[in-house]
Amino acid sequence: MITLENLIRVGGVCHFGILTASATLPLVLDWRKSLGALPKIERQLILAWASFIVLVIIGFGTVSLVHADDLAAGSTLGRAVCGFIAFFWSFRLAWQFFVYEVRDVIEANTRWLWVGYHGLTLVFIYFAVVYAMAALR
């Protein structure tokens, strides 16, 4: 049955799926080469920021899987957590649509990269909608 709780659980699984897709990013974007040109401290900062984002996504996925019932119940804390997750992914979508310039990267690679990019966009939209529904409940 389609319930908000189950939609949140699906979101939890999708968070871990995103991490799998994100693991290919350093190879696709050839981070070794592009980051190699930066001073060491800047490379370290970028890798630290990427690590923090991974930890946040692991947290979103874990909370969504373990506490989907609490998040869907409409408590103040559950709504606040869902609101933050919805805001996070809405902000990420804004970057996807208005800031990132991916055309060259996508055209220079395979059709799978195009499919993956647009597939991730759909997942980000799913996150923004489902968690906003839970937050506004």
What label would you give each PLM region?
Residues 20, 126-129:
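A structural signal for well-ordered alpha-helices, especially hydrophobic packing surfaces
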Residues 2-8, 14, 18-56, 63-74, ...:
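Interfacial loop at the N-terminal end of multi-pass membrane proteins
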Residues 67-94:
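Short alpha-helical packing/oligomerization segments
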Residues 56-60, 123-127:
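Hydrophobic cores of alpha-helical transmembrane segments in multi-pass inner/ER membrane proteins
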Residues 128-137:
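Juxtamembrane boundary at the C-terminal end of a transmembrane helix
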Residues 48, 83-85, 110-124:
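Individual transmembrane alpha-helices with interfacial aromatic-anchor signatures
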Residues 90-105:
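Transmembrane alpha-helical segments of integral membrane proteins
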